[in-house]
Every structure is written in C-alpha cells, then in structure tokens.
Amino acid sequence: SDNLGARPSRTLAQHFENTGAPFMAEVAIRTKADRKGGHIVRDKATGRLILREMSQVHPDDKEAAQDITKHPYFNTNSIWVRIDALKDKLAECDGVLPLPVIRNKKTVNPTDPDSEQVIQLETAMGAAIGLFNGSICVQVDRMRFLPVKTTNDLFIMRSDRFHLTDTYEMEDGNYIFPNVELD
C-alpha cells in the first residue's frame, strides 16, 4: 500500500458533502523529506488545481518545485470523489479518464545503479483533481499519511514502533519516520 494512514473519516466525509465539490484531495504540510513528492499547483491557463509529480517538472523549475515555502502542501494519495461527477466524467471520456502519463527513469535493479536503464510509465489517480471544475484540497494531519514505498518503510511499519489499534489503524504517536537503511 502507498498510504497506510488512509482510512474513512466521518469528519472529512461531512466536509466533502458540505462543500459540494466534485473532487477533494487530502494534502498535508510538506517537510524537507517530502520535497520530491507530488504537490498541488494551480494551472495558470484554466485555474484548476493539478497534481504535479517531480518527474513531470521541467529541469529548470526543479529547485522552485522543491521549495516547501512556495509549494507547502503535498498529495497524501487519499482522494474523495462524488460518484455522480465521476460517472459523468467517465461518460464524457468514453470510460477512460485522461490522466497524464508519468515517466520515471529507473534501473532494473534499484540497488545497482549500473544495471539496465528502464522507463516506468504510470498514472496517478490524484491527477484527476485537474479534470473536475471546482476540485478542492483539504489539509489533514500528518497521521493520515504513512507511506510505504520502500523495503525500509515496510521494515519500520512492521517494527514495534507502530501498532494496529482496535479500529485497525496504524498508530505510532509521532508519525515521523526514522531514517532506516537496510543492506
């Protein structure tokens, strides 16, 4: 899973209902550790919010994109979508959302930088924020974002630092990942 902090929230569901927005993305305050993650920007041409992943940023704009004072929020990968709005958008797009393709350069063996170079193609569901007029973001506590992207992250989540509550939520209390490097 990409975010073990994601879970249903009555408070967020009520907020989403009250806004009437077709799409809502949960965002959290970026720290220096989050500089390379996706963040929300406003499209100058359309005024819509869009998700911008670092691999989509032009090299000349990388420094500004990583500036956490200029772009203070990052995408937690938790979204809320009105079913009727999604149904209408899918009908408009012949059943396929036109999400941008993200191109990531990687190596076949991530532990060996000299292994064969490959290109990973992916889309991010959070990028759908740019498809709906009136999309919004809601700032959430850091505890709603517990990413597991590497074996190091999984090691931390499976350690005794975190525990599963009676309501099946991962809990730690401080929600700041220690730096762990496995051999």
Feature-to-residue mapping (PLM):
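Left-handed beta-helix
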Residues: Q14-D183
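Acidic donor-binding/catalytic loop of UDP-sugar-dependent glycosyltransferases
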Residues: L4-Q14
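Divalent-metal (Mg2+/Mn2+/Ca2+)-assisted nucleotide/phosphate chemistry catalytic cores
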Residues: S1
